[in-house]
Amino acid sequence: MRSLLALMLLPLAGFGQQELPDPLQAGWKGKKVCEVLVENESVRTLRCTFPPGIGHEKHYHPKHVGYTLKGGTFRITDAKGTREVNIPEGYTFYNEEVPWHEVLNIGSDTAVFLIVEPKD
């Protein structure tokens, strides 16, 4: 019986993520925080800007590389909980995928990131 239930629920795995916006679609209180710099058949590159008190509402990320043009202090909430992090200028990161998170710039400076999403 458990096997049958597991098979019936399998198509719903990941359903919530598909309902979430991607980084370009997500914004903050109805306003965009990311803009497309480059998009072609191989890659999409976004610049995301977060003045103090501005965040990025709950969204998912496909595989991506990020680079911090201007650092800042953020409150990040994801499946692991909520934490505050200082992201320095020049910080580079890679994620295979981020099922969901939301962020808020709690610092006093505007932070700017490049997000590069390869299209496989």
Q: Which residue stretches match the model-derived regions?
A:
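Ligand-binding loop in jelly-roll beta-barrel domains
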Residues: 71, 98-119
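A short glycine-rich, His/Asp/Glu-containing loop-to-beta-strand
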Residues: 27-57, 63-66, 116
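His-enriched metal-coordination microenvironments in redox/metal-binding proteins
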Residues: 57-62, 101, 105
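N-terminal low-complexity, Pro/Thr/Ser-rich intrinsically disordered segments
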Residues: 18-30
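Short beta-strand segments in beta-sandwich/barrel cores
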Residues: 55-56, 72-76, 92
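Short acidic-glycine-tyrosine-enriched beta hairpin
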Residues: 81-98
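Bacterial Sec-dependent N-terminal signal peptides
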Residues: 1-18
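Glycine- and acidic-residue-biased ligand/ion/polar-headgroup-sensing regions
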Residues: 61-80
